[in-house]
Amino acid sequence: MSWLRSSPLRQSFSKAGGGSGSGASSRGGNSTNGTVRAFDASECDPKACYDSFCIHWQQAFEIIQRSENNRGQSHDDVLGVVTHLDHMVTLLLVELHHCNKVGLPGAPAPPAPCLEHLLSENLLDKLYEWGVKTGRYANAVRLEQLKLYEQLVSHSRHQLLVHEPFLRPLLKILASSQNEIYPPDVEKRLVILLNQLCVVLMQNVHLLDLFFFSTAQQNGSGGHANFIIFSLLIPYVHQEGSLGHQARDALLLCMACPRRLDRGTYIATYSSICPVWFTRAGEGLYSRLPNQIDIKTIDWYRITTDDVTELQELTLFMNSLEFCNAVVQVAHSMIRQQLLDFLYQGFLVPVLGPAVLQTNVESQISAMAYLDLIVRSVTEPGLIQIVVKFLLDEEKFDGQRILDVLVERLNSNDTRLCMVSLSLFDTLLSLNCEDIMLELALKYLLNCQHVPISHRFKVNRVDPYSNAVEYFLNTSPDIMKKVNNVLNINNNNNNTSQASSMLGSGPSSMPQGGRNVSKTIGANWNHYGNNTGETLMANYQAYLLEARNRIVQCKHACDQWNNVYRYQKLSKLVNNSSSLSHSGNGTAGSEDVRTYKVQMIKNFLAEFTTAPDSAVDMAGDGDRSSLCQSPAGMFGTGHHASHLMATTSKQLDSLQSLGDSSGYESLNITNLGTGSEDGRRHEAWKVSSVKEETIVDLDLSEDLFAQGTVSLGPFLTAIWGKLQTFTSNCLYVNLHLTGLISHLAWFPLPLLHSILLRPDIPTTSDTPSFHQVLKILKQQIDAELPDCDESLEIVDVARSFLVDREFRLINMRKNAIESNPHSGKLLLPNGATGASGPVSMTSNLSQTTPMQLTPSSSYDPFKRNDTKRKSISNSFSSIFRRPGSSASSGLAQVFQFFTGGGSSSNSSSISHQSSSTPSPAGSQQYLSSNSSGVSSFMGSSRRESREAETQFVDHPSIGGPPSSMGPTSLTSTGSPHNSLEYSLVNINGSIVGGIGSERQRDLAVSAVVLDEWLKELAAITQEQCIIMISDQVSSQKPGKLS
């Protein structure tokens, strides 16, 4: 029947002649070569068109009558009717084009004699009755009828649906199409017609009743029938390509109609869209996803848009999820609620929950990656709400919460699982959800038991001098301070002799302070302009700008929360007394409040009777000023009130750490003799109450875990635990870890600031405080990476490696296309047989490429954050981030970048690397245009650059022959302790053999990352302080800041 399938569809009043069958040549003399003859409606005589229309119908009707008398349909009969019908459609389009011309206001509509004849003579009904009897030609005739209806619905300005001669045969052909399997061309025409009908219904909502009542009549049983448009469209919702897209668009349009009428109940009750969707999406599409993902790149950590495009099963699942998100956005409230209920009860709990709770590590990685993809894709608050409910639900999973399981996996020794977990929590934080933040951290900090009593008054106060900024900058390792000084000297030298500096003129042209540092510090960093010595990305101002943007965005979201999470200085009793004073006897109530305040102060002073008077007075005055503040802005309503009562049973435990203003003094105190221990402790407490303490050396032999009994919660405890192993973690673990902590610091929550950004506030938790861990890392790096020429050169190579990685990301599209156009393919492993193969499929994410690497790809499930994801806001850290399975950390990976695994390939690798490095001018122009997104290490708005992080350098794997497949990803070759014998190559191509040990190289990378991260924390601290002061100035009178 190809001769009928090639029948022309006249669009925009053009006629396509010809076909693929033998009968095409008989079409009224039309060309058989597929030529197009354009129609000009202005040149056609309306009377002649009408006469021709009547003649074609008369001839077609004669053929219909003759075939009915012969009791059989011949090939020539069907072809003749179709040919005449084809000409009739053309004449109708010409007439409709003439009628649709814009006329004068108030002028009568031009006549449409052809259309009137079509309706008055019931031609459509006669065609339908004849088409039913055409036997094996029924599909071909139906195809022509669907084309006719489509043209009339889409081009006619008349409301044809209100005319019974048009509506009755239309409903007949739609009703007869239910539960039928048609050829692809008929399905396509049917979906197009349904789409056009939905457009008309959207424009004329009152016509929706015609289809509801008519479908009930078609059922004939007196009961309710499914809405016929839904019944026909639902089977195509999960189809691939344009057919599925048109079906989903049509359903969305039709669902938007009941939102304006009281038809949502009918659709929700009598249509099967929700059960069908979740049967296919939950049990069908998700179960087809690979159960295990074969990760080949060392820095992979999440599914990207290209992964979705490359893997057909994932594309179908995401299309279905996008459709669900759109339905929730536009549908009637009852439909929306039913859809959310089905999603929770039919997909999240029975399908996704068990998948996340699997015990196999590979399955856990894939399930968490899918969960991360789902959270990043949904945008509607209703969907986000049920996802949060899924994470916090205890009843559905035998008293075990999904969120608690995810927190436990942060401590995993598997690098890939740890990276995926960190990435997932970064995605959860990007939701800025109050419930998530409350469960992760805030509920453990609300009562402020982690802060000694004498310091709690500082929690809600602003540090106007921002001493924490200086603290973070001073915590940088000594080796990095030396390198930064050398860079500053070189930059000053560049201002006077830029040309010689660009060429790396050698030690003779460098100042004395920079002669012993390798040449790369003077050459490579000039790509960044005059401020290259301050930071890898640009300068400290860029960190400030990025920090302010992130904080403002986060603050805007947190302003919508139901509660204000601040430390409450008054107990529940005081709040109750205050409420009584307003409702009853005001004098008596106020007296009770004052009595209680005095008693609290007496209890406080009684604990420190041995302390000097001045210190006690200062602490007492501080608490008195805090206690006298109005409780109007305090948090504490509903079920959260139990977390806010001040407890005094463990105040003696807090006394132990009162001396650590910054968390370090008390550690040295405990090592002194018992005779002077108490005196030193009280002296330290006195000093910490009066002024900021300077950072002193930390005794690493001290047991840091014996300092207190207050827990910060499993989430923060897991984060601190990972931070303590910073120098031994994989490079990409550290990048995600630092980004996650920076993301926490963006929140405008003083309780979080007290443990992250306020070194002047000590903590009494059962783990080392955040600032203690930073000091430990500094001393560890200083001890193992001394300030010498060899260490400076190792750090120099590490910085060069990281900055060249940044350049490769800037030019990732060019490098990817030129190096390996076939990279990033998702392949099934050997032995897999596709959809009919084993249940546990494995998808090979051999190289996850950025979205821009697929020019033809139009799929983007992360549209909502598109404007954020376009920036290179990833600061220094987001440049080199993706987890590997288990690989050596730090500079153990530099060898693959520079040498490709052997000295024989050094020259080719370096030449390719050099070709991929942008010119200094181009680099500076790019960075200056993106200065607003330079500094942050992690965050939801940096997804695109992190997704794009992959290696594009053409080199073979370690110890293997040269690769013929273009660029290869960084691949794990075994355990994290593999012995890699290699030499480092600096940026100029010279081989630096045997520089330090592998441990020193790892420490060098850790030092660079730590140095940049501390700058970011300093910028965040400074901007948080400015924003808090601005808020107080706007809400209080000048001079009343406290």
UniProtKB/Swiss-Prot annotation:
It comes from the Eukaryota. Pfam families: DUF5917, KELAA, RAI16-like. Residues 1-31, 494-514, 821-866, 905-977 are annotated as: Disordered. Residues 1-14, 839-859 have a biased composition (Polar residues). InterPro entries: FHIP, FHIP_C, FHIP_KELAA_motif. Residues 905-940, 956-976 have a biased composition (Low complexity). Belongs to the FHIP family. This is FHIP family protein AAEL005291.
